[in-house]
């Protein structure tokens, strides 16, 4: 008697057991854990590269401005007091606004009226205030998580209300002391830095050498970032006004604390990018030699660290390796 066989039954495939499935899931999890940091590092490397390119474009724009006008732009314009408006809150355009044409933002430059209208006058007109809130990509580091509008850098005035300006990730280098700017305004003393109110620094004024002088550095949202348009009244608000688009090297890179909004810092691990006066961009380690213990007011040639020396253009001191 013949035995009937079922070919279909013989072809039934064996499935995964629960243990095998768990092993496969574990292998996939391990691969993800190994690959994810590499992917994140690659993305951050791309962001750092874009940040560096942004600063290179800013450097080229600053030098093109110098080529056209014989000086670098002012850190900010010292606005004329308008007593018919009020006696405080005089906002002034900053270095970022002055180089808009060199950054292919000529239309925005003309709409703002940078050459013929003071910023505080523009802010009086409600219809024109949104111009200060336009984000310019070259002023934004892709690692910086800042929102489009910087609500930590607000133009405050009873006459035109509160206006939050567009965020920037870069600040002009104002040396190592805010008071150098006020010293210059009062006594016309040289503040030793690249940017200050009404500054007109020429390349020949950078006697320490353009390759040894910071011009622009990073400012991260974790410490309130910056704005590109300019500053609010720095005479009434002191350094709180100037630090809107300028920074000083009196505190360490990426150092948290109450003084951080005055300093330089980035979202990159280990340091921050700086644009030098010769146009090159270099990543400066947060462990760079730092010493501000003997920064005697009125005597910028006193003993300072390498970091502080790089923030001054004509202190006459040799700069060590960094």
Residue ranges with predicted function:
Residues 1-18, 79-82:
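N-terminal leader/signal peptides at the extreme start of proteins
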């Amino acid at each position: 008697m013949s035995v009937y066989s079922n070919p279909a039954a013989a072809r039934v495939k064996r499935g995964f057991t629960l243990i095998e499935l768990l092993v496969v899931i574990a292998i996939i999890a391990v691969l993800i854990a190994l690959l994810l940091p590499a992917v994140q590092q690659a993305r951050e490397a791309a962001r750092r590269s874009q940040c560096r390119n942004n600063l290179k474009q800013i450097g080229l724009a600053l030098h093109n401005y110098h080529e056209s006008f014989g000086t670098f732009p002012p850190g900010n314009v010292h606005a004329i007091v308008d007593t018919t408006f009020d006696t405080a809150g005089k906002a002034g355009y900053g270095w970022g606004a002055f180089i808009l044409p060199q950054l292919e933002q000529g239309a925005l430059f003309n709409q703002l009226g940078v050459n013929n209208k003071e910023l505080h006058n523009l802010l009086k007109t409600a219809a024109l205030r949104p111009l200060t809130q336009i984000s310019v990509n070259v002023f934004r580091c892709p690692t910086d998580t800042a929102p489009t509008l910087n609500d930590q850098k607000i133009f405050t005035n009873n006459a035109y209300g509160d206006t939050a300006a567009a965020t920037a990730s870069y600040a002009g280098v104002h040396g190592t002391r805010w008071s150098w700017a006020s010293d210059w305004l009062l006594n016309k003393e040289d503040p030793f830095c690249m940017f200050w109110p009404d500054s007109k620094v020429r390349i020949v004024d950078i006697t320490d050498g353009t390759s040894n002088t910071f011009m622009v550095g990073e400012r991260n949202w974790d410490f309130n970032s910056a704005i590109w348009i300019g500053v609010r009244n720095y005479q009434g608000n002191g350094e709180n006004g100037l630090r809107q688009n300028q920074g000083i090297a009196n505190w360490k890179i990426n150092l948290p604390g109450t003084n951080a909004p005055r300093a330089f810092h980035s979202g990159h691990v280990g340091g921050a990018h700086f644009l030098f006066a010769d146009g090159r961009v270099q990543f400066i380690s947060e462990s760079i030699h730092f010493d501000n213990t003997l920064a005697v007011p009125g005597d910028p040639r006193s003993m300072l660290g390498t970091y502080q020396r790089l923030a001054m253009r004509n202190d006459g001191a040799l700069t060590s390796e960094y």
